[in-house]
Amino acid sequence: MSKLWGGRFTEEAEAWVEEFGASISFDQQLVNQDINGSIAHVTMLAKQGIVTKEEAEKIKIGLQYLLEEAKQNKLHFSVEAEDIHLNIEKMLMEKIGEVGGKLHTGRSRNDQVATDMHLYLKEKVEHIIKAIKQLQTVLVHQAENNIETIMPGYTHLQRAQPISFAHHILAYFWMLERDVNRYEDSLKRINISPLGAGALAGTTFPIDREYSAELLGFNGIYENSLDAVSDRDFILEFLSNSSMLMMHLSRFCEELILWSSQEFQFIEMSDQYATGSSIMPQKKNPDMAELIRGKTGRVYGNLFSLLTVMKGLPLAYNKDLQEDKEGMFDTVKTVEGCLHIMAGMLETMTVNKEKMGQAVTQDFSNATEIADYLANKGLPFRQAHEIVGKLVLHCTQKGIYLIDVPLATYKEMSALFEEDLYEVLSPYAAVKRRNSAGGTGFEQIEKALEKAKGLTKEAIKN
């Protein structure tokens, strides 16, 4: 097969060399974006008088035909045509004849592929934002159902203070909200057009870059043609944002895995999101949560892979940039899948309120309450801290908990202790009292839920 760029060459490459250099096996995912970009480009060429209206109309009819074929998965791509751009151009010329060769006037594959990826990521980032909002809605529903479900809060994976389960869930809501904000902000840099930058230096044809950008829904154009064809910051930013999102999902999955274990028994996964063992019939494994945790690593890898590709590239385009796509495609697929699984997993899990309640009555997570009790009576907090530390030591030696210590023993430690101390030791009361802004107090959770619901409703409207 003769190449569309073959005029300079006297020998054809070996088949295995062609296969090594071809990208059609993966960049065919850009087929819709490539055709839509071409439709906008030829429309602009006609407006500027670079091609005739009749030629443009014939080209657009051919492109529309290919677009419909693509939507029905009827296009057949070839390695010999290398990439999505030359495959489409070859098919177009087979369909409408030599006039199809005018499509590439005033354009290079360098600005063409960059345009395709901007269009692709714009669409996918908007989808991901919607998927995050759906997950946030699930979190809000779970939080609403568990405002007064008391559980241990942890530091160093040691029981620290009693908190509301709703408060714990909403922590992830706000992590995800930051992820949404980052993705939304990245759209400012994704939604600009490199089309018309040419190979690197622009073009001698009197093109109208702003017009083609407007046709494609971009908010503006790259100001520098070298930057336009060599920039992959927008992909790196997407991979970085996705890495942070996956880190948040992975942290939550780690907790779900722990909570579903026999050692915790705080939650039970739905059978839909768990698997069994081929040898141990009693097992119910949290495989979906483990997979999300594991897939986080591949998204990190995609980010570092492209950073490494980019770090030594001189301006402008280099073939190394062919390596920018597979990690991007893989990350989109991974993130979309993980968000979908995460939402279903959280929506269908069963919360074991009784086990959570037992965990905060058979521990020392109420120790801070006693220290605060003494501090509220005028004792310096550091002295109160030391007294309570001795009380905890006394309890561990006796095999009892703070609620079991008689008042007389408390009074031996400090005359400030009174009968009302035992009200303070209630985990429910401890949670209720923590009513500072952003705290686990029930009033604060209600306020947080109102804000969270407002954000999810606003997203649904948009």
UniProtKB/Swiss-Prot annotation:
GO terms for biological process: arginine biosynthetic process via ornithine; L-arginine biosynthetic process. InterPro entries: Arg_succ_lyase_C (IPR029419), Argininosuccinate_lyase (IPR009049), Fumarase/histidase_N (IPR024083), Fumarate_lyase_CS (IPR020557), Fumarate_lyase_fam (IPR000362), Fumarate_lyase_N (IPR022761), L-Aspartase-like (IPR008948). One of its GO terms (cellular component) is cytosol. Pfam families: ASL_C2, Lyase_1. It catalyses: 2-(N(omega)-L-arginino)succinate = fumarate + L-arginine. GO terms for molecular function: argininosuccinate lyase activity. PROSITE patterns: FUMARATE_LYASES (PS00163). Belongs to the lyase 1 family. Argininosuccinate lyase subfamily. Its EC number is 4.3.2.1. Keywords: Amino-acid biosynthesis, Arginine biosynthesis, Cytoplasm, Lyase. It is found in: Cytoplasm. It is an enzyme of class 4 (lyase). Gene3D superfamilies: Fumarase/aspartase (C-terminal domain) (1.10.40.30), Fumarase/aspartase (Central domain) (1.20.200.10), Fumarase/aspartase (N-terminal domain) (1.10.275.10). Pathway: Amino-acid biosynthesis; L-arginine biosynthesis; L-arginine from L-ornithine and carbamoyl phosphate: step 3/3. This is Argininosuccinate lyase. It comes from Bacillus anthracis. It comes from the Bacteria.
